[in-house]
From Swiss-Prot:
The gene coding this protein: petD
NCBIfam families named in the record: cytb6_f_IV
GO molecular function per UniProt: electron transporter, transferring electrons within cytochrome b6/f complex of photosystem II activity; electron transporter, transferring electrons within the cyclic electron transport pathway of photosynthesis activity; oxidoreductase activity
Chain's role: Component of the cytochrome b6-f complex, which mediates electron transfer between photosystem II (PSII) and photosystem I (PSI), cyclic electron flow around PSI, and state transitions.
Gene3D superfamilies in alphabetical order: plastocyanin oxidoreductase, Single helix bin
InterPro entries: Cyt_b/b6_C, Cyt_b/b6_C_sf, Cyt_b6/f_cplx_suIV, Cytochrome_b_C_euk/bac
A Pfam family matched in the record: Cytochrom_B_C
Name used for this protein in its record: Cytochrome b6-f complex subunit 4
PROSITE patterns membership: CYTB_CTER
Record text on subunit structure and interactions: The 4 large subunits of the cytochrome b6-f complex are cytochrome b6, subunit IV (17 kDa polypeptide, petD), cytochrome f and the Rieske protein, while the 4 small subunits are petG, petL, petM and petN. The complex functions as a dimer.
Membrane topology summary: Multi-pass membrane protein
Transmembrane feature ranges: 36-56, 95-115, 131-151
Species per Swiss-Prot/TrEMBL record: Hordeum vulgare
Length: 160
């Protein structure tokens, strides 16, 4: 937790600013018009200038042209869809695969209700939520790595 600056209410300059209605923060400077008219547009234009500059100086290459007669043997999704792809690939029933995919966010929504503790406490004082997180991370990594392997080695990751 950072150290916050406490205002000196005996300061006559601060008291004068508070009397004018300018005391919504410690320094007495209002967000309007200073921040909203001068600082924010400079930051926004600077961000746009950086993006345009990078796009002009280093344009992204368009890849090789598509060839519909030379498709790969197995098409893989993007890396962040590997665990879901592995679930759909290994479960024999489509309905069961969809139910398993729906159960992941449903299970994540129930984690805060598993323990009735303050949310800012140490994770080691919340063993159930920490265990659910660690098991979920291991399972997601296992499914993600397995999705890159052939179907016969995907569940065991080729170890057995």
């Amino acid at each position: 937790m950072g150290v916050t600056k406490k205002p000196d209410l005996n300061d006559p300059v601060l008291r004068a600013k508070l009397a004018k209605g300018m005391g919504h923060n410690y320094y007495g400077e209002p967000a309007w018009p200073n921040d909203l008219l001068y600082i924010f547009p400079v930051v926004i234009l600077g961000t746009i200038a950086c993006n345009v500059g990078l796009a002009v100086l280093e344009p992204s290459m368009i890849g090789e042209p598509a060839d519909p007669f030379a498709t790969p043997l197995e098409i893989l999704p993007e890396w962040y869809f590997f665990p879901v792809f592995q679930i759909l690939r290994t479960v024999p029933n489509k309905l069961l695969g969809v139910l398993l995919m729906v159960s992941v966010p449903t299970g994540l929504l129930t984690v805060p209700f598993l323990e009735n503790v303050n949310k800012f406490q140490n994770p080691f004082r919340r063993p159930v939520a920490t265990t659910v997180f660690l098991i979920g991370t291991v399972v997601a990594l296992w499914l993600g790595i397995g999705a890159t392997l052939p179907i016969d080695k995907s569940l065991t990751l080729g170890l057995f």
